[in-house]
């Protein structure tokens, strides 16, 4: 999982965070990489049969969001590395000593303990933000990919350091829709445009037949594919993202 950040909100406090993590001196944190959104009323949620009302995915309701800014990209491994290097923060996955990895990223010999109702997620020793599959070093091999194996607490700590905050779920959905109303995707209702897939998702019969090219079987660069109408990249696919 990764996280997208909103720009600072003057007097917002997160009591869950570790107060030993001090804010970075970089007061202009990636400001050039933020998009300011006007906000306003929009239709949040969906009536599609696959939604989970218990998670707030439905029913459709009219919601208002104030003006806010949000980063154009998910937080990358290289950006998260700067945070780790400066603060010496230890993520939850590092504390636990393991995290879950999608089975296709692993050799069969590494596929041991899995999730009972989702056997495609395998428990892997040492998997964390810089070892996405437990072996390959992220900062060396995937610096511009979104950081993964991030808990909600990790995301909050990163925001505290960078002087940003997580978007609310309403803000995130407003941003993801890119100004389109009740469409399945940020570009419309069809997955393909001119026969081309527009996001990094499983392409085939899940979970055993992924027809995506090798470079897109797992995560891909945060600037891959076209942005939505708000100038935001990968607002569907690639990774799950945290909200507040």
Regions found by a protein language model. Name each.
Residues 38, 64-66, 71, 85, ...:
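A secondary-structure boundary/capping signal
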Residues 2-30, 55-63, 87-104, 170, ...:
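Surface-exposed recognition segments
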Residues 76:
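Acidic-aromatic/histidine active-site loop/patch
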Residues 42, 47-66, 135-136:
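Short, conserved catalytic-motif segment at the N-terminal edge
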